[in-house]
């Protein structure tokens, strides 16, 4: 099973989540690639599960300079793709993740796991378990 994890991180929390998720998915037998969104291309959606991570920014939105343009570039081609979402936040109640999940479902993606959100610093075990859950 091939899992691609693409993320953007400002403080390092979402990057840490990506690496823990990789650890869990690897432990469950998946072949996992982790990329910062700055290195990602639309072809990276060609995998068994695409796992996207972005923290909440500003008024609970996705990061606008790198991550949002990537999401816009794949929004028209994610129909039928298995997708999982994760991210960290410093305040608020997770509205950005609910909005993002709805947006991807509207685009036709198949959400394969309940989105993982953490306040500030991630707990490794929680992220590792999320990674394991992606391997079916």
Tell where the protein language model's regions lie, with residue ranges:
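FMN-binding flavodoxin-like domain, especially the glycine-rich phosphate-binding loop
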Residues: 13-16, 20-35, 45-136
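Extreme N-terminal starter segment of soluble prokaryotic enzymes
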Residues: 1-4
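Short hydrophobic segments within beta-strands
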Residues: 6-8, 86
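Short, polar loop motifs at secondary-structure junctions
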Residues: 38-39
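His/acidic metal-ligating clusters that form di-metal
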Residues: 42
